[in-house]
Amino acid sequence: MTHTGIEAALSDLLFNRDLTLDEAADRHFTPDYRQRTDGEWADRAEFLDHIAHLRTLVVGGKVEVHEELYDGSKYADRHICHITKKDGSTVSMEVYVFADLAPDGRFQRIQETTLMLEGSDADRNIGSAR
């Protein structure tokens, strides 16, 4: 099975402006995708609202994957997302992910917990801001 990973998915969603939001989402997430971030569930539409909001704030960044595990349809990782915002400020979030992959290799469900490593108090909810 060919499968996506968090680095490819987040890079396409946040940093690859050659892809529309829908193109990036369709590449990495199923139509019935759901996500739980720090205890708050979002369906695919709510998740895409969140990413659309981030695209208005973010000018660049990178995703560093420190651990990553695939086991059949299960996926887990620990990564740090480094973001540079349009105002020049930076945010770094460490994220712990557990996910289910669909048979086609796209994310079907993600549950994640975030820890801000760098940024202002206003950025603490950047992982779920809409």
Describe each region flagged by the PLM.
Residues 21-22, 44, 104:
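Residues at or immediately preceding the N-termini of alpha-helices
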